Amino acid sequence: MSDQLIIYGVPFSQPVRAVLWLMLYKQKPFELAMINPGSSSEGGSRHPDFLAKFPTGTIPSIEDKETGFVLSESHAIMCYLCNKFDWDDLYPKNHEQRAKVDSYLHLHHRNVREASIGLVAPKVRKDLN
C-alpha cells in the first residue's frame, strides 16, 4: 500500500504527535507535510493555499490522496482512522466502551489542551502574542 494519507503539521505539536503515534503504532504508511502553525507565509497554516483546503487553519489535518477526503482536529482524525481501518482494539464498536473513549477524548481536549495552550504557546511562539 502506498502512502495514501498525508498528515499536515509539525512533530513539535502534541496533537500532531498523537496522530503520528497512532499511525506508527499501527504501522500504517503516511506522508508528513510540514506546516508551520499560525504562519501566513508559504508552508503555514494561515496561508491561503492551506486555508483553501482546511478552512480552520489548524494542524493536524489529513488528506486521503485516494479519495480526496480532508479532515482537521486530532481527536476527530484519530476516530476517523480507527473507523476507516477497523482498529477496534483502540476505538471499540461497542457503544458503551466507545463512549468511555469519547469521554476521555473530550475531557482531554477541553481541559488539558485548552488550559495548556495559553501557557505554552506564548513562550514557544512569540509571534502569536
Question: What are the functions of these language-model segments?
Answer:
Residues M1-L128:
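GST-like domain detector, emphasizing the conserved glutathione-binding G-site
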